[in-house]
Amino acid sequence: MKNNRRNFIKNLGVMGTTGLLMPNLVLGNTQENKNIMTNTTRPKVLFFDVNETLLDLTQMKKQVGKALNGREDLLSLWFTTMLQYSLVTTASGQYEHFGNIGAAALQMVAANNGISISEDEARKVILNSLRGLPAHPEVKEALAQLKKEGYKLVSFTNSSNEGVKKQFESAGLTDYFDERLSVEDVGKFKPFTDTYAWAARKMGVKSEECMLIAAHGWDVAGAVWAGWRAAFISRPGQQLFPLAPKTEIVESDLQKVADVLVTYK
């Protein structure tokens, strides 16, 4: 026992501050991360997040900001509140449409900042702001390239089935996808592990044969922890979660992600 204790203390000394703050560098996960980065086998299915990843949210942010009396500085708080309560809803064994949670979050943020928004007003703001969102400029060309290369493309969103259907019709994205998946059908929001497992089963593939492409660090983290591969699009204001495993592909837009994926065999 004393020898074990002495060895433990000795190892702590060897690790030093670097080992305590960045254990991956000391405990041998470097090779694992290297393997992730050099995996160039083709995923069987590419799953795409929708809002921010494929669709440009500039218009939505302006409308929500207007509802908050021009307080665009509150937009990030509104979105994180919406995400927080989607997690609360799932963790409590409940389900509400993401749009309804977004409207409730809008009311909460407004109330905390002395702004009055009724339930009906909040729902109209969220519903109207999500309609007619355009695709990011590079999205259609990138999707066409991936489809031409034989990839199976599936959208995978926290939004409702009807909501994403209308969004795709408006943005002209419908024909690029083989399938549309919504968490509405499983009743659990991303990034819960069960939700990614459900999507893999739905498409008849193993978790390790899936790749999520998303512009949200929380979504990418959830996918990787669920055993998926992932590509992160670093849209402005978006960051990877530093405590999550390494992400296989990190690029600034979907075209650059596609350029990497077409080299996979």
Q: What is each residue range found by the language model?
A:
Residues K61, L75, F79, G99, ...:
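An amphipathic alpha-helix signature
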Residues A144, S160-N161, K165-K265:
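Asp-based, Mg2+/Mn2+-dependent phosphohydrolase catalytic module
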Residues G28-T30:
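Boundary at the C-terminal end of the N-terminal hydrophobic targeting segment
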Residues T40-T41, E149-Y151, M203-K206:
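Glycine-rich phosphate-binding loop signature in dinucleotide/nucleotide-binding domains
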Residues E121-P134, V139-E169, L181-V183:
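Substrate-recognition element of Asp-dependent hydrolases with the DxDx(T/V) motif
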